[in-house]
Design a protein with these regions (language model features):
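Beta-rich, blade/repeat-based domains predominating
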Residues: 1-14, 33-54, 74-89, 97, ...
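A short beta-strand motif characteristic of beta-propeller blades
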Residues: 25-33, 66-72, 109-116
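Structural signal for beta-propeller blades
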Residues: 16-18, 56-58, 98-101, 143-145
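Histidine/lysine/aspartate-rich catalytic loop segments that bind and position anionic ligands
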Residues: 28, 37-39, 51-69
Length: 152
C-alpha cells in the first residue's frame, strides 16, 4: 500500500494495483504483469514503481499501467523494498546480497551504493526523505537502522 496525492495504491497478492480514495472506495485499477509477484510499490508523479521479486526486477509504469521500463538484477529477491528520490532514481534492497542498489531514473543503469561495509545486513526497510535527501535503511538481522546522505 502507498499513499500519494490523496489516493491509496493497493496491491494484493494475485491482483492488479487498485487505486482507492481516502475513504477506501476503489476508483480505478492499474493492470500489471505478474501481479502475484509484486512485493512493494511507490508512486512519484505519474509513475508507479514496484518490485517483482520472483522475476528479480523493478518495473516503472505510468498510472494507466503502460510499462516505461524494467530493470532486472538477480539480487532483487525476497523482501525487495524500494524507494524513490526526487529525480526518479530507485533505491532497492538486495536482501541476500546485503546491498542497496540504485537504479537510474531511466532504468538503464544501476550500481551498488551501500554494502556490508556500511553495516548493511539483510536489509528489509528503506525510505527516502526527499526533502532532506536522506536514505533510511533498516536491517532485519541485527535491527540496525542507518541514515545515509543521497549524493547524485
Amino acid at each position: 500500500m502507498y499513499f500519494h496525492q490523496q489516493q491509496l495504491y493497493l496491491n494484493a497478492i494475485g491482483e492488479d494495483i487498485h487505486v482507492a480514495d481516502i475513504n477506501g472506495k476503489i476508483t480505478g485499477t492499474i493492470p500489471t504483469e505478474h501481479s502475484e509477484n509484486i512485493k512493494r510499490l511507490e508512486v512519484l508523479g505519474n509513475n508507479i514503481y514496484y518490485t517483482d521479486q520472483i522475476n528479480h526486477k523493478v518495473v516503472c509504469c505510468d498510472i494507466e499501467g503502460n510499462k516505461i521500463w524494467e530493470h532486472v538484477d538477480k539480487r532483487i529477491i525476497k523482501n525487495a523494498c524500494l524507494t524513490i528520490d526526487n529525480g526518479g532514481n530507485v533505491f532497492v534492497v538486495g536482501y541476500d546480497a546485503n546491498v542497496i542498489i540504485m537504479i537510474s531514473s531511466d532504468g538503464k543503469q544501476s550500481k551498488v551504493i551501500l554494502d556490508a561495509s556500511n553495516k548493511i545486513n539483510k536489509p528489509t526497510g528503506i525510505h527516502c526523505d526527499r526533502d532532506r535527501k536522506l536514505l533510511l535503511v533498516c536491517n532485519e538481522r541485527d535491527g540496525y537502522a542507518g541514515l545515509f546522505d543521497i549524493v547524485n
